[in-house]
């Protein structure tokens, strides 16, 4: 199935799987989704992910979700910049999520990264979504 917004699709799949207490969820594979999942993994919001190749030639990303005491580690995940309304932030105006307890994931000229990494690299970009 073709989606117009692959990031929103990924976020929705993760949110729905965690509401149902699933241990794994799969999503169509792409480099952008893999970059987003790499950020979530490095920040400790998911256990990991793996790329699975199907005989038909398409690839899928299988995401291992993370729980703590039976509760999902991701309490809140929200899309900020959408295809109809893009949201950009300079390095000075990068949003802090819940006073620094969460992260914003950005698409920058240096790749997809968390807000604190963007501050360290002194780059701004498109604010894709926030995680808490």
Swiss-Prot record:
Gene Ontology MF terms: rRNA binding; structural constituent of ribosome
One of the protein's GO biological processes: translation
Pfam families registered for this protein in UniProt: Ribosomal_S8
PROSITE patterns per UniProt: RIBOSOMAL_S8
UniProt keywords, alphabetically: Ribonucleoprotein, Ribosomal protein, RNA-binding, rRNA-binding
One GO CC term, this protein: ribonucleoprotein complex
Protein family membership: Belongs to the universal ribosomal protein uS8 family.
Protein name, UniProt field: Small ribosomal subunit protein uS8
Lineage: Bacteria, Pseudomonadati, Pseudomonadota, Alphaproteobacteria, Hyphomicrobiales
């Amino acid at each position: 199935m073709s989606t117009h917004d692959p990031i929103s699709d990924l976020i929705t799949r993760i949110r729905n799987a965690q509401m149902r207490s699933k241990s794994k969820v799969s999503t169509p594979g792409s480099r952008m989704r893999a970059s987003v999942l790499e950020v979530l993994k490095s920040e400790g919001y998911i256990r990991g992910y793996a790329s699975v190749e199907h005989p038909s030639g398409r690839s899928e990303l299988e995401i291992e979700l993370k729980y703590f005491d039976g509760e999902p580690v991701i309490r809140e995940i929200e899309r900020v910049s959408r295809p109809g309304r893009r949201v950009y932030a300079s390095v000075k105006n990068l949003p802090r999520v819940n006073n620094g307890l969460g992260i914003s994931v950005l698409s920058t000229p240096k790749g997809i990264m968390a807000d604190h990494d963007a501050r360290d690299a002194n780059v701004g970009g498109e604010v894709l979504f926030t995680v808490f």
